[in-house]
Design a protein with these regions (language model features):
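Phosphate/pyrophosphate-binding catalytic cores of soluble transferases and nucleic-acid-acting enzymes
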Residues: 1-193
Length: 195
């Protein structure tokens, strides 16, 4: 197996031993670890996210841990862009990238690609969330269906996160979130390991 072109993805629930496994694998194959957990990117969430402690890094280079403030907007698209750069950098040094985490959207982004929806300003997104809170989930879903009728076929009224996202994307871009979706695939040689 040509490890220079391979990327390992280690995923599973919080505190399942992913980090320890990744460190052992990295030592064995000359790898470097890249964070793939949405909570572990934030400086302020060390304890809540079961982030590996510096001592446990054991001379294995770790990337994208605790570098962003929770006060800053950080999307899965932002993460994917940084990860692609890290992968190139790691490979230039003849090492093997090992992505570790539990965030499904991050793994979906690396395995399937992401839709290139423009960044929506935080102020705009905050107003949408306030509207949702003010009028309630049921009424908000009705408003979404009026704004974007096709959405009722793809999102459940009880899935607050997706309902709000579909609404804000339609309102901001004038296109349905479902129009943005494209069939994309990863160009990487991936090995998935579930812990």
């Amino acid at each position: 197996m040509d490890l220079k072109s391979k990327i390992f993805l280690i995923y599973g629930p919080t505190a399942s031993g992913k980090s320890n496994f990744a460190i052992k694998l990295a030592k064995k194959i000359k790898g470097e670890i890249i964070n793939a957990d949405s909570m572990q990117v934030y400086k302020e969430l060390k304890i809540l996210s079961a982030r590996p402690i510096l001592k446990s890094y054991k001379n294995i280079k770790h990337h994208l841990y605790g570098f962003k403030s929770v006060k800053k907007n950080f999307s899965s698209g932002d993460w994917l862009s940084l990860v692609n750069k890290k992968i190139l950098d790691i490979r230039k040094r003849n090492k093997t990238p090992i992505l570790v985490g539990g965030t499904g959207l991050y793994f979906k982004a690396i395995t399937e690609g992401l839709v290139n929806i423009p960044n929506i300003p935080i102020r705009f997104r905050s107003k949408i969330r306030l509207l949702h809170k003010k009028i309630g989930a049921k009424k908000f879903f009705s408003e979404l269906v009026k704004l974007d009728p096709v959405s009722k076929n793809f999102v459940k009224p009880t899935d607050t996160q997706r309902v709000i996202r579909a609404y804000e994307v339609k309102l901001f871009t004038k296109r349905s979130i479902y129009d943005w979706f494209k069939s994309t695939r990863s160009n990487y040689d991936l090995s998935l390991i579930h812990i």
